[in-house]
C-alpha cells in the first residue's frame, strides 16, 4: 500500500512539473505575440517609410539633374543623344519631360548617328517605342519652413481724438483635421470610499437542519459519588403459598452424650411450639362408601389458626 502511494506521489509531481512548464511556455508565447509582433510591424512600417522618403528624394534629385542638363543643352545649342525613355519612366520622370525627349530623339541622328531615321526604320539600339505614361506618384514630404519675411511698413499714426480700444482681429481659421489618438494614460488614483450601505434587518431563523448520523459511542464515564443511604425497608407480611418440600437431608454425625439432666418435676410441661408441616402422605386405599351422614351444624367463620406462625428476624 505504501509503495502505491509513493508511485502516485511521484506521478503527481512529474505531471505538476509538466503542467508548470506548459503554462510558462504558453505565457511567454502569448506575451511575445502581444508585444513583439506590434513592435516588429511598427519597425517594418518605419523602414518602409524611410525607404520611400529616400526613393522620392532620389527621384527629385534626378529630375533636378535632368532639368539642369536641358538648361545647359539649350544654352550651349548642342543637342546630344538622350537615353531611352523607358529607363526614366522607372525613375518617376514627368510625362511632359518624356514627351519633349521623345520629340528630340529622332533629331539626334545627324549629330551622333545613333538615332533612327524619321522614315519609320528600326532603332539601331534595338529598343522599342516608349510605353504609355504611368500613374502619378505619391505626394512628396512637406518641405522645410521658409525664411522669415522682411518687416512690414509702419502703420499710420492715430488721430488725436481717437481713443484706444481692444484689438479686433478677425481671422477665419478653419478647424484642422483631428490628430491621431494618443497613447492611453496611466490608471487614475482610486476614488474615495463610498458611504456605508444600509444595514440589513434581522434575519429570520432558518428551519432546523436534518438530524445528523449518530456519533460513535463515547468513553465510559467515571464512577459517580456514592449515594445517600436509603430508608430502612419495611416488612410486609404476605401469606405465601408453601413451596415444595425439599429432599431429606443426610443424617448428621452422632453428637456427644449430653450432661445428665436434672430431675424432672412431677408436673408435665406445657405443649411445645408447633412444628413445621410434614410432607403429605401417600394416598390411602379407597375406602368403602359410607352411609350418608346427617347434615352438620353451620361452622364458624374461618380463622388463621391453621397457619403456622410467621418466622421473623430477631427484634420484630
Swiss-Prot record:
<feature type="region of interest" description="Triple-helical region">
    <location>
        <begin position="269"/>
        <end position="304"/>
    </location>
</feature>
<feature type="region of interest" description="Triple-helical region">
    <location>
        <begin position="206"/>
        <end position="235"/>
    </location>
</feature>
<feature type="signal peptide">
    <location>
        <begin position="1"/>
        <end position="36"/>
    </location>
</feature>
<keyword id="KW-0732">Signal</keyword>
<dbReference type="Pfam" id="PF01484">
    <property type="entry name" value="Col_cuticle_N"/>
</dbReference>
<feature type="compositionally biased region" description="Low complexity">
    <location>
        <begin position="276"/>
        <end position="295"/>
    </location>
</feature>
<feature type="region of interest" description="Triple-helical region">
    <location>
        <begin position="240"/>
        <end position="266"/>
    </location>
</feature>
<comment type="similarity">
    <text>Belongs to the cuticular collagen family.</text>
</comment>
<keyword id="KW-1015">Disulfide bond</keyword>
<keyword id="KW-0677">Repeat</keyword>
<dbReference type="GO" id="GO:0005581">
    <property type="term" value="C:collagen trimer"/>
</dbReference>
<keyword id="KW-0176">Collagen</keyword>
<feature type="region of interest" description="Triple-helical region">
    <location>
        <begin position="176"/>
        <end position="202"/>
    </location>
</feature>
<dbReference type="InterPro" id="IPR002486">
    <property type="entry name" value="Col_cuticle_N"/>
</dbReference>
<feature type="compositionally biased region" description="Low complexity">
    <location>
        <begin position="183"/>
        <end position="204"/>
    </location>
</feature>
<keyword id="KW-0193">Cuticle</keyword>
<protein>
    <recommendedName>
        <fullName>Cuticle collagen 13</fullName>
    </recommendedName>
</protein>
<comment type="subunit">
    <text>Collagen polypeptide chains are complexed within the cuticle by disulfide bonds and other types of covalent cross-links.</text>
</comment>
<feature type="compositionally biased region" description="Pro residues">
    <location>
        <begin position="205"/>
        <end position="217"/>
    </location>
</feature>
<dbReference type="GO" id="GO:0042302">
    <property type="term" value="F:structural constituent of cuticle"/>
</dbReference>
<dbReference type="Pfam" id="PF01391">
    <property type="entry name" value="Collagen"/>
</dbReference>
<feature type="compositionally biased region" description="Low complexity">
    <location>
        <begin position="256"/>
        <end position="266"/>
    </location>
</feature>
<comment type="function">
    <text>Nematode cuticles are composed largely of collagen-like proteins. The cuticle functions both as an exoskeleton and as a barrier to protect the worm from its environment.</text>
</comment>
<feature type="compositionally biased region" description="Pro residues">
    <location>
        <begin position="307"/>
        <end position="316"/>
    </location>
</feature>
<feature type="region of interest" description="Disordered">
    <location>
        <begin position="127"/>
        <end position="316"/>
    </location>
</feature>
<dbReference type="InterPro" id="IPR008160">
    <property type="entry name" value="Collagen"/>
</dbReference>
<feature type="region of interest" description="Triple-helical region">
    <location>
        <begin position="128"/>
        <end position="157"/>
    </location>
</feature>
<feature type="compositionally biased region" description="Low complexity">
    <location>
        <begin position="127"/>
        <end position="157"/>
    </location>
</feature>
<feature type="compositionally biased region" description="Pro residues">
    <location>
        <begin position="241"/>
        <end position="251"/>
    </location>
</feature>
<feature type="compositionally biased region" description="Low complexity">
    <location>
        <begin position="219"/>
        <end position="234"/>
    </location>
</feature>
